[in-house]
């Protein structure tokens, strides 16, 4: 049983998956930084200095000026955080879409090259017949 687990864990797909998860985690941090440190300030500037991280609806307690104070005072809906996460998601989805699209294009090109290199059985036989006829002349 231990041997089977070792074979399973050391298969290429499992290792590839582990590497993908690690890279995905690092990519998530990078996207968060891009969104929070670059895009959100620009969007805030365009929208008149609105700070999305501090946008909320307070459901209970006295009205507070900041999200952290409102959360301490009672229930809140943090829709600014949702907007930020939505932008994160859209950026990640767009980058992954471009990556998959380029990988599919590369794969299609390789398949076309392999297909053009491989001759069908008929083509091989005709080539052999042609070569034999050329030798007889």
Swiss-Prot record:
PROSITE patterns: MSCL. Channel that opens in response to stretch forces in the membrane lipid bilayer. May participate in the regulation of osmotic pressure changes within the cell. The keyword Transmembrane applies. Belongs to the MscL family. It is found in: Cell inner membrane. The chain crosses the membrane at residues 15-35, 38-58, 80-100. GO terms for molecular function: mechanosensitive monoatomic ion channel activity. This is Large-conductance mechanosensitive channel. It is a multi-pass membrane protein. InterPro entries: Mechanosensitive_channel_CS, MS_channel, MSC/AndL, MscL_channel. GO terms for cellular component: plasma membrane. The keyword rRNA-binding does not apply. SUPFAM superfamilies: Gated mechanosensitive channel. It comes from Bartonella henselae (strain ATCC 49882 / DSM 28221 / CCUG 30454 / Houston 1).
